[in-house]
């Protein structure tokens, strides 16, 4: 008997998609189907965890420049 898995369609930039694919490569528990360069189907019950992991990863990699001190 076939089983169905509830999924959510995610459309994002290729850079974000590559992070999601990397996160999934550890346990293969997030992505149901990789559709194209900007689209994935992910497990519905993993969406909140995925958002949190993406936020953490982006905080690690994105560091805005600190404002320069005024040198009078």
From Swiss-Prot:
SUPFAM superfamilies: TFB5-like. Keywords: DNA damage, DNA repair, Nucleus, Transcription, Transcription regulation. GO terms for biological process: nucleotide-excision repair, preincision complex assembly; transcription by RNA polymerase II; transcription initiation at RNA polymerase II promoter. Its main location: nucleus. It is found in: Nucleus. GO terms for cellular component: transcription factor TFIIH core complex; transcription factor TFIIH holo complex. Belongs to the TFB5 family. Component of the 7-subunit TFIIH core complex composed of XPB/rad25, XPD/dnr-10, tcf-30/SSL1, tcf-29/TFB1, tcf-11/TFB2, tcf-14/TFB4 and rtf-1/TFB5, which is active in NER. The core complex associates with the 3-subunit CTD-kinase module TFIIK composed of div-66/cyclin H, prk-3/KIN28 and rtf-2/TFB3 to form the 10-subunit holoenzyme (holo-TFIIH) active in transcription. Component of the general transcription and DNA repair factor IIH (TFIIH) core complex, which is involved in general and transcription-coupled nucleotide excision repair (NER) of damaged DNA and, when complexed to TFIIK, in RNA transcription by RNA polymerase II. In NER, TFIIH acts by opening DNA around the lesion to allow the excision of the damaged oligonucleotide and its replacement by a new DNA fragment. In transcription, TFIIH has an essential role in transcription initiation. This is General transcription and DNA repair factor IIH subunit rtf-1.
């Amino acid at each position: 008997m076939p089983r169905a898995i509830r999924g959510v369609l995610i459309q994002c930039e290729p850079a974000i998609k590559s992070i999601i694919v990397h996160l999934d490569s550890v346990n293969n528990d997030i992505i149901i189907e990789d559709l194209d360069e900007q689209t994935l189907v992910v497990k519905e019950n993993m969406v909140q965890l995925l958002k949190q992991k993406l936020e953490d990863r982006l905080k690690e990699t994105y560091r805005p420049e600190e404002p320069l001190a005024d040198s009078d």
